[in-house]
Amino acid sequence: MFKEKDYVRYGSRGIFQVEQIIKKELKPRHPETCYVLSSVYGIHTQIVTPASNPQLRRVMNREEIDRMIDEMPLLESDWIDDKRKREETYRSILEEGDGHKLAQLIISIYSQKQDKLKDRKSLSRTDAEMLERAEDLLHEEISLSYKIKKEEVADYLLSRLKNK
């Protein structure tokens, strides 16, 4: 259970701060503990969701992010040739919002992008959009934990990975 002012990842919706913990009747005569969440990035959004929502998870702390960044050079591309299966798998990863899986997705699509550039081709629009969304989700979490601007995360990651 989260506390007020905690930061949480709400699947692919992004990072939110728990503003309040309330009791709300989502079903008649069945009060349920709910979180009132406010978005941290982008358009200000407020959401009320049950505390039992499986899409909510704690934002990774700095140590967890450091470990993930250290492991990134060891990750290999996990490209799925079947376009439909790839889209389904990647959408599921985006919905889940797990940082490690997002990093794996980014590496897979980025590796494919580099291979295509060698042949003077480009990614499909869907793959490019998924790469952008995955980077955005991961950068939000890193930005919050490191207390840096989201726009600075890519440069920070590049400098960290160059030193590995």
Residue ranges and their predicted role:
Residues 1-57:
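A positional/architectural concept
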Residues 54-164:
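Charge/polar-rich, low-complexity and marginally structured segments
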